[in-house]
Design a protein with these regions (language model features):
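Short amphipathic alpha-helical leader/targeting segments
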Residues: 59-60, 144, 166
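Interfacial loop-to-transmembrane junctions
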Residues: 128-154
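Short helix-capping/hinge motifs at transmembrane helix termini and TM-loop junctions
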Residues: 21, 106-110, 137-138, 167
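Hydrophobic, small-residue-rich transmembrane alpha-helices and their short perimembrane loops
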Residues: 1-101, 112-125, 132-133, 155, ...
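Selective transmembrane alpha-helices of multi-pass membrane proteins
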Residues: 122, 151-163
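Juxtamembrane boundary at the C-terminal end of a transmembrane helix
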Residues: 161-174
Length: 174
């Protein structure tokens, strides 16, 4: 769930930043695709490294404790290369699914509805993810959903504003 939230939030903010900067539809779409691919790869790599490094640390600590090299399979709860690959795969997929939320409306809707559709889909998905987090945080679903929407929307508005400021500065410098 966290990977999906990362994908949704980062791609929503990224796309709103270039929308604020007055980018063309092609540039906005390319930015969304690049955000999806680069973010998914980054999440997968980070997850693989995290699981692999944790496993290597456990092996190293077991070696020191026993004063010898411990076979990996004797470690309690030890991770394997398969665990790292599986974690990386799921991080990649979850991030990509989240990143698709702002991207698909922009890609599929008529020009007049692209930005509104992207914002609406992203806000709806933020709310749903917030509802889902209420299963784990002992907060009410409404509170969790609205909090997620407020934070995600504020971040997207901030990047939109940065895009507008950059566009204004670029126009002034001409």
């Amino acid at each position: 769930m966290l990977g999906a939230n990362d994908g949704l939030s980062s791609n929503f903010c990224l796309m709103m930043g270039v929308v604020g900067g007055g980018a063309s539809a092609t540039t906005i779409l390319l930015t969304g695709v690049a955000g999806l691919v680069s973010g998914s790869c980054s999440m997968a790599l980070g997850e693989w490294l995290s699981v692999t490094n944790s496993h290597e640390l456990a092996v190293s600590q077991a070696d020191r404790a026993m004063g010898t090299a411990a076979p990996e399979e004797t470690l309690p709860g030890g991770s394997s290369a398969g665990d790292a690959a599986s974690a990386a795969f799921f991080s990649f997929v979850l991030f990509a699914l989240g990143a698709l939320v702002p991207l698909l409306p922009f890609a599929l809707l008529p020009a007049a509805l692209r930005i509104v559709g992207t914002i609406a889909a992203s806000i709806a998905a933020l709310f749903v993810l917030g509802l889902a987090t209420s299963l784990f945080n002992a907060r009410s679903p409404l509170f969790s959903g609205l909090r997620q929407v407020m934070i995600g929307s504020a971040a997207a508005a901030f990047t939109y504003g940065i895009g507008q400021a950059f566009d204004a500065l670029a126009r002034w410098a001409r």
